[in-house]
Amino acid sequence: IGGAWSAAAGSVAVLAVSFFAGHTQTFLLIAYLGTAYFVFRGRCSGRSWVWLLGRIAVVFTLLMLVSSVQLIPQVQFLSLSTRTRLPFEELARGFVLQDLVQFVVTKFGRTDLWQPLYIGILGLTLALLATPLRGDAASRFWLSVAIVALVLTFGGNMALYNVAYWILPLFYLF
């Protein structure tokens, strides 16, 4: 088995394990990020869109075959889930913009129980210094991923969530 096929097999294995874990939202986010990173790396190495889309199709076809034993129960579970009947307004709940203070301050405001956004001053400083100091495409890609992920956590308080909800496949479930 050549390098390209072993990479495809590895991708299928990672995605299948994620799917079999039974947390559909996590699987979906891993699949989105893995696909985006594959496209990024492929475009950086000069691969054509046809080549990239062909490899993505192969990986997801093999993934469907490997995970088919769990696919029907998972679809049934999703159809019975209460989340599928929730209105957009309920699904679009997210952080409020004031929660950004939690990056550097704990025990602040209405969500002071968990501090889900806390990074700390050192962590935030190192993250912000990494991109300009390295200046390579990979740093810019991961900074973009972090920004998109952060904006999506604000749910309906930011327009990007609305776009993702209506455009990305299966994103409307979460």
Task: Label the predicted regions.
Residues 6-11, 24-32, 144, 161:
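Hydrophobic alpha-helical membrane segments of integral membrane proteins
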Residues 19-28, 110-111:
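Membrane-interface helix caps and helix-loop-helix hairpins in membrane proteins
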Residues 29-62, 134:
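Perimembrane helix-loop-helix junctions
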